């Protein structure tokens, strides 16, 4: 347990540029405080001691805003950044050196007993507000975008974004866990593709409109010449056609 506590302490300096000194980290980082209490409550929980592990968890939630069930298994070097609103269920497993942001839920999907919470591999990043629900497996080095909802297994090295979570194939480029701007934007990509398709369809429609307008002009011109209609009637027909097509002669 001591090694885990030391790793929890050191990882903050590696991942948070705002960490100035050990005194500030020890007293002003609720994520570290919640993990410190959890590691003691988890030890008591595994020994079968009733009541006190849950009481410690409750007090930790009161003081830090982070709720970790004493039964949850959390590896070393885990960093809960900001932390407010984080919920980690009883049977959840969090791998070494994972990064969890505020508002994250590692929860269940019902009232089933047994293993009912997710298992996170090593070096997993769970963005702010993300929900990982059910007895699912999240592979090593997975990145879960902010606000995503994950309900199925995710292989190692994949990125998950959106609601419901969609897996993005790994590009082979390894990025720093804190570089949120490099997360793929699948919704934005789809919107750009749809806009490009709309632009192409508009160009095709404009071409067809121009062709129809030219054909209608020639047809009206021949009709007027053959029947000796008054020019005003021909102009009226042209005006109606152009108003229908949305253009002007």
Curated annotation (Swiss-Prot):
Domain of life of the organism encoding this protein: Bacteria
Main localisation: cytoplasm
EC number: 2.3.1.30
CDD domains the UniProt entry points to: LbH_SAT (cd03354)
Single Gene Ontology MF annotation: structural constituent of carboxysome shell
Catalysis performed (reactions): L-serine + acetyl-CoA = O-acetyl-L-serine + CoA
Coiled coil: none
GO annotation terms (biological process): cysteine biosynthetic process from serine
Cystine residue pairs: none
The entry's keywords: Acyltransferase, Amino-acid biosynthesis, Cysteine biosynthesis, Cytoplasm, Repeat, Transferase
Pathway: Amino-acid biosynthesis; L-cysteine biosynthesis; L-cysteine from L-serine: step 1/2
A cellular component annotation (GO) from this entry: cytosol
Keyword Signal: no
InterPro entries to which the protein is assigned, alphabetical: Hexapep, Hexapep_transf_CS, LbH_SAT, Ser_AcTrfase_N_sf, Ser_O-AcTrfase, Serine_acetyltransferase, Trimer_LpxA-like_sf
Pfam families given in the database record: Hexapep (PF00132)
Subcellular compartments: Cytoplasm
Family recorded in the similarity comment: Belongs to the transferase hexapeptide repeat family.
Name of the protein: Serine acetyltransferase
Source organism: Synechocystis sp. (strain ATCC 27184 / PCC 6803 / Kazusa)
Gene name linked to the record: cysE
